[in-house]
């Protein structure tokens, strides 16, 4: 049985919408994939709701970002079959989403300064379906 236990979708920094991952995995011969997006429970919720799709087992997972203060660097922890109702886990994901939003908004504003054809509103329209960013237009 072949599987990939670390796959990202557009719920975090992946390029493929979560709904299409199983069919791609099936075409490549995988029997199971773990939907392990960064600091969001969206992919785990999807996997719990769609345990098997296109003949591929969907394993609920989340990749949690943490910090190793002793070694002074960021770490990523893969968590399989997370309790999506756990208050501490939900709070961690909410905090990380706020940080990601602030960083994305700052990056978008910097891009607007460099490239007049780029607008934060256009970037928001392109990415809002992912559910990963919470941008409110100033207009």
Regions found by a protein language model. Name each.
Residues 135-139:
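Conserved small/polar residues in nucleotide/adenosyl-binding loops
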Residues 1-72:
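An N-terminally biased module of ancient metal coordination in phosphate/nucleic-acid-related enzymes
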Residues 48, 62-101:
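Active-site phosphate-binding/coordination module
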Residues 20-24, 82-87, 114-117:
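Short amphipathic alpha-helical segments, especially helix-boundary/capping motifs
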Residues 111:
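Conserved, mostly hydrophobic/aromatic
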Residues 116-128:
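Short, surface-exposed acidic
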